[in-house]
Amino acid sequence: MNGFMIPLALSILAHVLADFVFQTDNTAKEKSEQQAKGFLKHWIVVFLTLVVLMMPFGLMDVLLYCVVLSLFHILLDVFKSSIESKRGPATRFSMFIIDQLLHLMLIVFLVPISSFTIASSFSAFIVWIDFHTGLNLAVLPVSKMLSVLIVYLYVLFAGAVFIRKLFDLIYKNQPDYLERIVGNSSSLDNVRTGKAIGIFERLLVLTLYLTGNVASITIVIAAKSLARFKNFDNKDFAEYYLIGTLASVMIAIIGGMILEVL
């Protein structure tokens, strides 16, 4: 199984990039509305991301694998969308988690039954780098490096989706909860920037956890709280902020714990 660790990691990396980094809000909206063009655009992104990341193994060797995996990826998305369209926030929250598990299980199933051969051009490139720079890329812990990258991307970007769906679940009886909490459109624009703030927050918390500076995490939380201090008079906002911050920190710490055992 060790020989499959790199293609396995590259496949998971392609999935994370295609689902959470390269997928636009418009494409996600089209998929949620079960529009064919949304699924088609997402399939193209998934397929091209897979092809690019699998290039070290040679295009012809992995082309069938990329086609099969990307098609099954879209079928899972169609299945998820068809269920979510008939249900509420609780189903969408659980289906998000189930969908990610199914995608990972699909990759784990397909990789061992596929053939991966290092392309001669890629091997020549490694030799060229070694000869001209003295860097022996062959001894790099590639699998570990890919694992770190995957967990970081999941924590940063999938974490944002998880938190949004968590809020939708908590405030399921208040469909306009954002407007009610922030009070006006200008504040609503500020709430949208919370996604970017959350990404940086999880980046810092995860890095601090992995470097053993757990106590410094409180400084990150304190700095974020100071920036929003004047909004805490609004009880609804204070609860919203607390839930989001705790969920964000929890996701980052869980990511760090996963990396510790990998």
Model-derived regions, located:
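Alpha-helical multi-pass transmembrane bundles of energy-transducing inner-membrane proteins
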Residues: 91, 95-99
